[in-house]
């Protein structure tokens, strides 16, 4: 039966149903289709989990826009302050929102003064409003730093009093929501920012911590000591040298074929040097002083002897000539003062100086053998090692004068066996565990669809004449029903008996179906159905088989 015949049969069956049955059939079809669609939508509806709760209206709006732009399904809670996303999308959604600094509830800043009336406002309220506004403005500025999602600032201003002995200083604390790396790197900048924004606030009086309660920076933090700062300088120098060596060797060796270790000994002592330099060539005569002294003296000694007569008063006798002596002295002192140019140099060194470097580089022997080619000659490998040692020395700035050491060896790497193997993917059980919810939903949907088709659509199709084999058998077996051989139907069924006999190869005058022979007819009617069926099979096996197939289809329906 072709498609046109099936369509004709379908329209004929519909016309035979009547208006009431057609309406019932249409309602049943609509209900079945709606049930299947509703079940499919409900079963495949993704389950949601909470992303954020207790959000403000502005945050909900911004988060909804961001999720919609990223094609992430979401639902807003009935309270208007919570957002839900599909299960498994929480981490992705939070990372996406963190990149945009959401949620970021607005901190009140200087706009607080716009809503405060001056009438009846006490000095205490003015001070509190000023501190709140300052905290909000500083928090807004901190949130502008890349990687910081939210921030809160608390400032304690000193109370003013006339009878206080010691002067109080302001203090501040800052809480940020950011990753550990960003928080630690930005802690020092945040401290200086807050200290510069509050009058009289010292950097050591600012404490910074993250949302997990971990202290990032404080005044008594041991990490701010001179020792830890020196260790940080050493680590930075070592990592910088390792990076330079990696950049020099990676292009032809590959990052997985060598390992570098640098040990640096630094001198981080602070030095203060002050020196004065004089220029003797630039002297200028400033003053001259000259002192002259002359001394003269003479002495004469008489030649008379000392007697008693010399003591008697009498005219003084003339003495004889004695010894004479004279002295002369002359002194001259000259002093000249000069002005000389001088230069005073004061040097303060807070940096570091490298005292010694020790560098160790281990290279994968397999990579060197591949570079040397076949056969792998040891001389070629040694030549490569010498060239790489020169490269390492130049990249690290090795100075043999200060005792720097570079050691470069070729070894067999164990990691190369692992690097050649692909990373195994998740197992079957792991995949089933991850997708268990989706599998259950799919199986439930298939089961519901099967039940609807089996108990609803299949009987309906059978009633309308669908099912190609059943319709074909019904068409072929039309007119093959067993005739009524009873006497009551003899008068009206003469033509039927005649047709039935002709179907099985008999004419109207055949004595087997002759209605005139009532005795023989009654005898055949009294025979059981098995006997009559056997006679029909004997007459025409093919047509009897068609009738049996039709009976089997009707019984199954």
Curated annotation (Swiss-Prot):
Signal peptide: none
Region: Disordered, residue numbers: 279-337
Biased composition (Polar residues): 297-313
GO biological process: bacterial-type flagellum-dependent cell motility
Record Gene3D superfamilies: 3.30.300.30
Keyword set includes Ion transport: no
Name this polypeptide is given: Flagellar M-ring protein
A molecular function GO annotation: cytoskeletal motor activity
Places the protein is found: Cell inner membrane; Bacterial flagellum basal body
Assembly and interaction partners: The basal body constitutes a major portion of the flagellar organelle and consists of five rings (E,L,P,S, and M) mounted on a central rod. The M ring is integral to the inner membrane of the cell and may be connected to the flagellar rod via the S ring. The S (supramembrane ring) lies just distal to the M ring. The L and P rings lie in the outer membrane and the periplasmic space, respectively.
Alphabetical list of InterPro entries matching this protein: AMP-bd_C_sf, Flag_M-ring_C, FlgMring_FliF, FliF_N_dom, YscJ/FliF
Source taxon at top rank: Bacteria
Family, per entry: Belongs to the FliF family.
Membrane-spanning residues: 23-43, 436-456
Summary of the function given for this chain in its UniProt record: The M ring may be actively involved in energy transduction.
Gene Ontology CC: one annotated term: plasma membrane
Alphabetically ordered keywords of this record: Bacterial flagellum, Cell inner membrane, Cell membrane, Membrane, Transmembrane, Transmembrane helix
Comp. bias regions, Basic and acidic residues: 280-296
Pfam families in the record: YscJ_FliF (PF01514), YscJ_FliF_C (PF08345)
Membrane topology value: Multi-pass membrane protein
Main location class: membrane
